[in-house]
């Protein structure tokens, strides 16, 4: 069937900012889909609010709108552009929910817009828990005993019938938002009321828990002629009860008999046929390990996290083909892009094993609740490919960058066995490592199975890994055992530990005896057809399939899994760098391990190595490919941290040299440089012990900022006000030592400014200067950034330009540099310098049309910026005002304090652009999920040091008609200035403020930190209550001020004569 030619223009909705449950996989899917539709000759219009994506580049669609993903804004775009059709299944849950709202409000009908791909009725049938259950009953497909509730009372009625444990699943949400497992009345009350709040339909499904069953997923495709195939089936190692996004997953499934595999395959295809899915779809099933009983858990009628994983696991481009199916093409008429000879209707076959392990943010949020359940908590994931299950698992573990390299924790031997078993019996993110530790201590597999319900097949594999460890210990230095361990994925580091050697010695031993990996191709067909995809994984076998060309090559290191502080922005820069390398005539090679991203799409680079980003794994590739050099400045801290390790092996680091990278990172050298070029920084000292830190602080004067050297995303950074807090920090937060000193700096309050620049060694160009709304002290990734600066004087701008040029040339940057300044009352100071690509590169590139990562890469290859037509200094400003607003995922993370500070907490970002600052801020805030209302009630409770400042704010909010609630201290202050405020009680008292928040009486909360134990706990409870109830809580008065400006611009002020 040929494609449809009754439609010309297609609107694609992206998935918005990265949050837990909706990460980079949608950038990958959206990019693929837009390109696929353009390839078929359609005009594509894209709307997405996330500037950090490849998808929002002008090359990807014919028209790109970076606007908030809300009904009103998308409706405006539809009215303006008049598209013929809308493709909603590539924007995650956000895209689906938007399509449903636009249909229900009549916008699609009024503008004659058709929905492409899966019919709306099918989407609703899959997403609405009631309709789905009815359909399954008609098909005779078993679903767990369940009930739909719209109130907490109904939930308790159902509990009377089936008892605990119960699983709560809110309708029309993703990543299990608001859901959970309940074991008692208290949990049932809390989780159901939460779930009803987060569900757009105020509807929850309660089901009898089948925790302990095997969780199996099928990724399926269907077209309009009813051709349907299974692209990939996957098995969760963790049984049902842990969200699939938080589970360790293996593909293909390992423990199903052929009968079970075919039974579940038939059910999956039966269900998508009954739903009438056109495109990709993910089916989750639960299988009883002791019988052929199964249940269907849920169906996602769209491209998902699992489909990105399935695409990378098989090489079969699901999103690309789903987009083509949506415009009428069928599976039996589209060629599989990997083989180029077989059709897309052939099911892929794997001759390898892949493991996916989620990446959690608990290294950032040590107090966060680690226990895993049906609500997702991981920010990203890694994938690894091997020829044995053990190999793929161990490669995935060392891709995580937790400092773990193996099946066990770095300090594993220090725990006693009872503690280890206690940790295994709870499902949390470290359980896998504790299982390894328990097996090492001789705990039986039966005991572990009883605690975890993990299949014996996997437990035997873990046992095998531990057995090999013991054999290595008994045969130190034995080459046979070295080879054997390599077959099962052991790293040199682990072998070195057991051999009692250094990692370097094991590496040399391998080189001398020619024990090196070969690289196998991922070809979708287990080598059945000829294939020429440049997509490889390493393994210790005999035949190497990666043919080395004689072209000059440049190797680019990717940024690994998405985590807080290192998001999709670095993948964006990686992809642009690759494009620049190819344009310059070199062969571009990528090494990365994140299955969600555009950079690991095999069609982007000349060669893709899907491997861990460790010294050993990267060196193996370099030894084979012998590139001209390696580029480290686009892969975040992951890549920068590998620079000196690779250089020791004689590898050429392209761009800013290793010694210059160190000059920017090493405190002493950096201070010397600043003195030489005459750029001031806040007074600071280094401390290697708590005593030294106290002496430093006494000299500098409080408040001081303390942090370890060499970190990204402000890990373990704090602002402290006195000796007691400093002592606390030095003893609990960090282990200071001569190798790892702690930096103690004077804390300057003032405007924070961020600048990105590109330098080729002679010329420095500055695409833009951004001003932060929050004053210094809030991490730059969590601040609202504004371009162009709104409140700086000509002198300040000139000084910033001058200092940036001096710094770039002084460090001798080749490529990108990111600098943060603070403007205090007595001038401009430099806060920090990052000699690499930064979080703001995509944002600035989009605004200014200066392809920063590409220019930086061209400079690294040796081209000159002046030859490209750029002049030194700040580039001409783009028209309009642009803001970058942070987006947080606190509703998924319990026990995490949402107060903004020097440690980064946001998972993503949105952009707002318009003609005035207020309009741009309105879009930025709306896009980030803060609903801006022109009237309502604000609750103020601020620390003593902020009481003066809050008066002005209260006055303005009062004038635009906001009602003010305040705690007694704040209310008394307001009364002095005749500002009316209703006094609310402290926690636990009469008219308690938490109850007011829970009852929905409050639209905005303004709360600033007070230090001191009891008060801190109160503040923490207030802030968490706002999160659980979905109310914006501003912990910085600067953000509150900006919000007030926006409210004033939307409304009229009422003042008496």
Swiss-Prot record:
GO terms for biological process: 'de novo' UMP biosynthetic process; glutamine metabolic process; L-arginine biosynthetic process. GO terms for molecular function: ATP binding; carbamoyl-phosphate synthase (ammonia) activity; carbamoyl-phosphate synthase (glutamine-hydrolyzing) activity; metal ion binding. Mg(2+) 4 binds at residues 832, 834. Mn(2+) 2 binds at residues 298, 300. Mg(2+) 1 binds at residues 284, 298. Residues 930-1057 form the MGS-like domain. This is Carbamoyl phosphate synthase large chain. It comes from Staphylococcus aureus (strain MW2).
């Amino acid at each position: 069937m040929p494609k449809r030619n009754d439609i010309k223009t297609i609107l694609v909705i992206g998935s918005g900012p990265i949050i837990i449950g909706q990460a980079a996989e949608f950038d990958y899917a959206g990019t693929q889909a837009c390109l696929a539709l353009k390839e078929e000759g359609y005009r594509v219009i894209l709307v997405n609010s996330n500037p950090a994506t490849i998808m929002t580049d002008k090359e990807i669609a014919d028209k790109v709108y970076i606007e908030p993903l809300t009904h009103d804004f998308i409706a405006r775009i539809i009215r303006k552009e008049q598209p013929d059709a809308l493709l909603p299944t590539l924007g995650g849950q956000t895209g689906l929910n938007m399509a449903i709202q636009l249909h229900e409000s009549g916008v699609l009908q009024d503008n004659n817009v058709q929905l492409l791909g899966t019919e709306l009725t099918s989407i609703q049938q899959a997403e609405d828990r009631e309709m789905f259950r009815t359909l399954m009953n008609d098909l005779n497909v078993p679903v767990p005993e369940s009930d739909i509730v719209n109130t907490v009372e109904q939930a308790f009625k159902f509990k009377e019938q089936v008892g605990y444990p119960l699983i709560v699943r809110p309708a029309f949400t993703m990543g299990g938002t608001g859901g959970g497992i309940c074991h008692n009345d208290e949990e049932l009350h809390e989780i159901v009321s939460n779930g009803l709040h987060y569900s757009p339909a105020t509807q929850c499904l309660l089901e009898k828990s089948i925790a302990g069953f095997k969780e199996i997923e099928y990724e399926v495709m269907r077209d309009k002629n009813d051709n349907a195939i299974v692209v990939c089936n996957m098995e969760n190692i963790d049984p049902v009860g842990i969200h699939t996004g938080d589970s360790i997953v293996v593909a293909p499934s390992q423990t199903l008999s052929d009968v079970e595999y075919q039974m579940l395959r038939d059910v999956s295809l039966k269900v998508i046929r009954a739903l009438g899915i056109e495109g990709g779809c993910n089916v989750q099933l639960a299988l009883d390990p002791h019988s052929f009983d199964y249940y269907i858990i849920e169906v996602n009628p769209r491209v998902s996290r699992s489909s990105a994983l399935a695409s990378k696991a098989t090489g079969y481009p699901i999103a690309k083909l789903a987009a083509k199916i949506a415009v009428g093409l069928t599976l039996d008429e589209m060629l599989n892009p990997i083989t180029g000879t077989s059709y897309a209707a052939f099911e892929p076959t794997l001759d390898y094993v892949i493991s996916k392990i989620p990446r959690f943010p608990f290294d950032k949020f040590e107090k966060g609740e680690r226990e895993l359940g049906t609500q997702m908590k991981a920010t990203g994931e890694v994938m690894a490919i091997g020829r044995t299950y053990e190999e793929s698992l161990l490669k995935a573990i060392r891709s995580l960058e937790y400092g773990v390299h193996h099946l066990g924790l770095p300090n594993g031997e220090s725990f006693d066995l009872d503690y280890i078993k206690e940790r295994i019996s709870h499902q949390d993110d470290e359980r896998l490592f504790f299982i390894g530790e328990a097996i090492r201590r001789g705990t039986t597999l039966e005991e572990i199975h009883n605690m975890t319900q993990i299949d014996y097949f996997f437990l035997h594999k873990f046992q095998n890994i531990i057995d090999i460890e013991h054999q290595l210990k008994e045969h130190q230095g034995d080459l046979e055992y070295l080879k054997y361990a390599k077959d099962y994925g052991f790293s040199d580091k682990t072998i070195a530990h057991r051999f009692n050697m250094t990692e370097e010695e094991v590496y040399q031993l391998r080189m001398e005896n020619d024990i090196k990996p070969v690289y196998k191709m991922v070809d979708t067909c287990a080598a059945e057809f000829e294939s020429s995809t440049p997509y490889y994984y390493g393994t210790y076998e005999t035949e190497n399939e990666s043919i080395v060309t004689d072209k000059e090559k440049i190797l680019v290191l990717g940024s690994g899994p998405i985590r807080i502080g290192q998001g999709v922005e670095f993948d964006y820069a990686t992809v642009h760098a690759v494009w620049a390398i190819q344009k310059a005539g070199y062969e571009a090679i990528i090494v990365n391990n994140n299955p969600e991203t555009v950079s690991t799409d095999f069609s982007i680079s000349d060669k893709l190595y899907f491997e861990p980003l460790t010294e050993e794994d990267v060196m193996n590739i370099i030894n084979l490919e012998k590139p001209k050099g390696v580029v480290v400045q686009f892969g975040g801290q992951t890549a920068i941290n590998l620079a000196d390790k690779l250089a020791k092996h004689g590898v050429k680091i392209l761009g800013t040299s290793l010694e210059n990278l160190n000059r920017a990172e090493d405190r002493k050298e950096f201070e010397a440089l600043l003195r030489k070029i005459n750029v001031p920084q806040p007074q600071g000292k280094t401390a290697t012990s708590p005593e030294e830190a106290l002496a430093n602080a006494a000299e500098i004067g409080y408040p001081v900022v303390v942090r370890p050297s060499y970190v990204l995303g402000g890990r373990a950074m704090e602002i402290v006000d006195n000796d007691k807090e400093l002592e606390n920090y030095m003893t609990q937060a960090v282990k200071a030592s001569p190798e790892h000193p702690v930096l103690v700096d004077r804390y300057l309050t003032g405007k924070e400014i961020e600048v990105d620049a590109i330098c080729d060694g002679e010329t420095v160009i500055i695409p833009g200067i951004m001003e932060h709304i929050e004053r210094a002290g809030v991490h730059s990734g969590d601040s609202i950034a504004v371009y162009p600066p709104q409140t700086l004087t000509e002198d300040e701008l000139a000084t910033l330009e001058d200092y940036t040029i001096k710094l770039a040339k002084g460090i001798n940057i080749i490529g990108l540099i990111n600098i943060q300044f603070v403007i205090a009352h007595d001038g401009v100071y430099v806060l920090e310098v990052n000699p690499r690509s930064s979080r703001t590169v995509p944002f600035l590139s989009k605004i200014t049309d200066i392809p920063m990562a590409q220019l930086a890469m061209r400079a690294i290859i040796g081209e000159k910026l002046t030859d490209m037509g750029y002049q030194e200094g700040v580039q001409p400003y783009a028209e309009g005002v642009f803001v970058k607003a942070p987006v947080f995922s606190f509703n998924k993370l319990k026990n995490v304090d949402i107060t903004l500070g020097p440690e980064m907490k946001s998972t993503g970002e949105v952009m707002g652009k318009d003609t005035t600052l207020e309009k741009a801020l309105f879009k930025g805030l709306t896009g980030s999920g803060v609903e801006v209302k022109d009237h309502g009630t604000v609750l103020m409770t601020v620390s003593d040091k902020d009481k003066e400042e809050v008066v002005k704010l209260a006055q303005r909010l009062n004038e635009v008609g906001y009602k003010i609630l305040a705690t007694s201290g704040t209310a008394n202050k307001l009364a002095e200035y005749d500002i009316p405020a209703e006094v609310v009680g402290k926690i636990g008292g009469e008219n308690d403020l938490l109850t007011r928040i829970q009852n929905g009486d409050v639209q905005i909360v303004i709360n600033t930190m007070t230090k001191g134990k009891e008060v801190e706990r109160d503040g923490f409870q207030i802030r968490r209550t706002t999160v659980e109830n979905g109310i914006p809580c501003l912990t910085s008065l600067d953000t509150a001020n900006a919000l007030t400006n926006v409210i004033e611009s939307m409304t009229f002020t009422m003042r008496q004569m």
